[in-house]
From Swiss-Prot:
HAMAP family: LeuD_type2 (MF_01032). GO terms for molecular function: 3-isopropylmalate dehydratase activity. It holds the Pfam family Aconitase_C. One of its GO terms (biological process) is L-leucine biosynthetic process. Heterodimer of LeuC and LeuD. InterPro entries: Aconitase/3IPM_dehydase_swvl, AconitaseA/IPMdHydase_ssu_swvl, IPMI_Swivel, LeuD, LeuD/DmdB_bac, LeuD_type2/HacB/DmdB. Gene3D superfamilies: Aconitase, domain 4. It comes from Clostridioides difficile (strain 630). This is 3-isopropylmalate dehydratase small subunit.
Length: 163
């Protein structure tokens, strides 16, 4: 799987309450819920993001409350993947479980800027910054985790591999 898009850059400790504020968690429709993605840190995020765009952040992305809604709204907003120096463990697991591609790569996270166009190859872990002509290498996920992401999440992966 390869993702290509423009970067939205965030710093350290972007918590789940910033990704999707708790005041909206009563909204059951994920597309509608996604219209509030990142609004407390960038109130124009949802109007700027295009299908395929990529979030790049530094340390501890997705910290805070255990909230499956956080990776769901990122995915539903059109973001194709998230790259960070590190992820909070529960966000990491929730992202895989719902099929949101993520990669940890400190060098990429520290050197990619807002608006850069990047290409991410999840099978190899190669992250290419097309804008700057740079390349970074993340550790790709094992095949079984890549299959979960390709099947759009854990439940779909289990259904697809029954048999």
């Amino acid at each position: 799987m390869i993702a290509n898009g423009s970067v939205f850059k965030f710093g350290d400790n972007i918590d789940t309450d910033v990704i999707i504020p708790a005041r909206y968690l009563n909204i059951a429709d994920y597309k509608e819920l996604a219209t509030h993605c990142m609004e407390d840190i960038d109130d124009k995020f949802i109007s700027k993001v295009k299908k395929g765009d990529i979030i790049v952040a530094t340390k501890n992305f997705g910290c805070g409350s255990s909230r499956e809604h956080a990776p769901i709204v990122i995915k539903e907003s059109g973001v194709s993947c998230v790259i960070a120096s590190t992820f909070a463990r529960i966000f990491f697991r929730n992202s895989i479980n719902i099929g949101l591609p993520i990669l940890e790569c400190e060098e990429a996270a520290n050197n990619i800027d807002e608006g850069d166009n990047i290409e991410v190859d999840f099978s190899t872990g190669v992250i290419k910054n097309i804008t700057k002509g740079k390349e970074y290498k993340a550790e790709p996920f094992p095949e079984f985790m890549q299959n979960i992401i390709l099947n759009e999440g854990l439940i779909n992966s289990i259904k697809a591999n029954r048999g």
